[in-house]
């Protein structure tokens, strides 16, 4: 009976150690994913900012071109 008790405790202990290691690895993976998400968000923000700046510059250029056509001598 004592042998079975020791074996059962050993199995439970090893199971807890294994579970603990899996939980730690899972937390590490979640942290890595959060860092990747943050990097992707920063990249998207900078991309949208660049697109917005280019669109504004194109709009100003188009407005200047239209003003040049409509009012050719007033620049």
From Swiss-Prot:
Signal peptide per UniProt: 1-22
Keyword field contains Repressor: no
Keywords recorded for this protein, A-Z: Amidation, Amphibian defense peptide, Antibiotic, Antimicrobial, Cleavage on pair of basic residues, Cytolysis, Fungicide, Hemolysis, Immunity, Innate immunity, Membrane, Secreted, Signal, Target cell membrane, Target membrane
Cystines in this chain: none
GO BP: defense response to bacterium; defense response to fungus; innate immune response; killing of cells of another organism
Reported tissue expression: Expressed by the skin glands.
Pfam families named in the record: DD_K (PF12121), FSAP_sig_propep (PF03032)
Propeptide: 23-45, 74-75
Proline amide modified-residue sites: 72
KW Cytoplasm (keyword) present: no
Gene Ontology CC: extracellular region; membrane; other organism cell membrane
Annotated localization: Secreted; Target cell membrane
Family: Belongs to the frog skin active peptide (FSAP) family. Dermaseptin subfamily.
Function (record text): Antimicrobial peptide with activity against Gram-positive and Gram-negative bacteria and fungi. Has been tested against E.coli (MIC=47.50-128 uM), S.aureus (MIC=189.98-512 uM), K.pneumoniae (MIC>189.98 uM) and C.albicans (MIC>189.98 uM). Probably acts by disturbing membrane functions with its alpha-helical amphipathic structure. May penetrate bacterial membranes, but stay at the mammalian membrane surface. Shows a very weak hemolytic activity.
Protein name as annotated: Dermaseptin-SP3
């Amino acid at each position: 009976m004592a042998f079975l008790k020791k074996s059962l405790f050993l199995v439970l202990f090893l199971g807890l150690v294994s579970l603990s290691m899996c939980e730690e690895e899972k937390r590490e993976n979640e942290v890595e994913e959060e860092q990747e998400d943050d990097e992707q968000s920063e990249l998207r923000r900078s991309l949208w900012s660049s697109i917005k700046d280019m669109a504004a510059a194109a709009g100003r250029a188009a407005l200047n071109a239209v003003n040049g056509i409509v009012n050719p001598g007033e620049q």
